[in-house]
UniProtKB/Swiss-Prot annotation:
A GO cellular component annotation in the UniProt record: membrane
Cofactor: Zn(2+)
Pfam families: Carb_anhydrase (PF00194)
Record Gene3D superfamilies: Alpha carbonic anhydrase (3.10.200.10)
UniProt gene name: Ca15
Molecular function GO terms recorded: carbonate dehydratase activity; zinc ion binding
Family to which the UniProt record says this protein belongs: Belongs to the alpha-carbonic anhydrase family.
UniProt region (Disordered), positions on chain: 269-290
Signal sequence region: 1-18
Protein name: Carbonic anhydrase 15
Active site, per annotation: 90, 155
Main location: secreted
Binding site for substrate: 231-232
Described function: Reversible hydration of carbon dioxide.
Length: 324
């Protein structure tokens, strides 16, 4: 069993290095010539009908009572194995998949069996003074967005996972800026200063319980689910997205530190701060957005007009019954 776990961990390390790692694309803030409008030229799936991110319109969501609570493994304790923080030129990634036992994973919550193993988490943010989340709830964005990327353990290769609609499960958390720092992000933010240029990776000086980055236990019951894609090329439609209703705070000074991370600029120019590393929202099309039993939904039709019509109909019916 130990040998099998070791082999799986090794494979996941290799697979994680391939997720969101292409260097042939960019964001508009880096160079509009290779920005999101051109991604479908590099990866045809980026122009497909089931792309991410999207706006979660609470008038369109449908309650789904099969969306039970998540079962988290390895999220409540700080692992002994070191974590790697990396600047890949497009975002900051925290690779957390070099574990030997009790590896972070999720199951339940309507996800297919057996489980989804955590590969990495990364962040999206805006330019100074602007919102930077990829998803939104009723058009409300966050200053940043955190993605926890998990891969279905029944697939043995990245190619297999990328080609299946249940290949990945990504947890999306909107981060809302506040004046006071959130100490749960301190270990990550303190490592940002060491990411002096794209391609640099450093070991974090300390690990922590991943659960500390998520909403509280009760708030984890409130989430939305839809089928979508990776939000960077190749944009494969292989993701079961979970967008939590409740946000997590992050300090203004901490957001500024992310906005100071260096990116790769156009040839001949010095690296400059990476900002606005988010993909524009994509059409929902005919997809369903499901709400967990505890999540908020909002009716698109007021009950008052319906009540008025019912009363009018009742009056007409009584007059017809009574005769002229």
């Amino acid at each position: 069993m130990w040998a099998l776990d070791f082999l799986l961990s090794f494979l996941l390390i290799q697979l994680a290095a391939q997720v969101d790692s292409s260097g042939t694309w960019c964001y508009d803030s880096q160079d509009p010539k290779c920005g999101p409008a051109h991604w479908k030229e590099l990866a045809p799936a980026c122009g497909g009908p089931t792309q991410s991110p999207i706006n979660i319109d609470l008038r369109l969501v449908q309650r789904d009572y099969t969306l039970k609570p998540f079962i988290f493994q390895g999220y409540d304790s700080a692992p002994q194995d070191p974590w790697v923080l990396e600047n890949d030129g497009h975002t900051v990634l925290l690779r957390v998949n070099s574990c030997q036992q009790n590896c972070p994973a999720i199951r339940g919550a309507g996800l297919p069996s057996p489980e989804y193993r955590l590969l990495q988490l990364h962040f999206h943010w805006g330019s100074p003074g602007h919102q930077g989340s990829e998803h939104s709830l009723d058009e409300k964005h966050g200053s940043m967005e955190m993605h926890m990327v998990h891969m279905n353990t029944k697939y043995q290769s990245m190619e297999d996972a990328r080609s299946q609609p249940d290949g990945f499960a990504i947890l999306a958390v909107l981060l809302v800026e506040e004046d006071r720092d959130n100490t749960n992000f301190s270990a990550i933010v303190s490592g940002l200063k060491n990411l002096s240029s794209p391609g640099v990776a450093v070991n974090l000086t300390s690990t922590f319980a991943l659960a500390s980055l998520l909403p509280s236990a009760l708030r984890l019951l409130r989430y939305y689910r839809y089928s979508g894609s990776l939000t960077t090329p190749g944009c494969e439609p292989a993701v079961l997205w979970t967008v939590f209703e409740n946000t997590v705070p992050i300090g203004h000074a901490q957001v500024v530190q992310f906005q100071a991370v260096l990116q790769t600029g156009p040839p001949g120019l010095h690296p400059r701060p990476l900002t606005s590393n988010f993909r524009p929202q994509q059409p929902l099309g005919g997809r369903r957005i499901s709400a967990s039993p505890e999540a908020s939904v909002r009716s698109s039709v007021s009950t008052l007009p319906c009540l008025h019509l019912a009363l009018v109909g009742l009056g007409v019916g009584l007059r017809l019954w009574q005769g002229p």
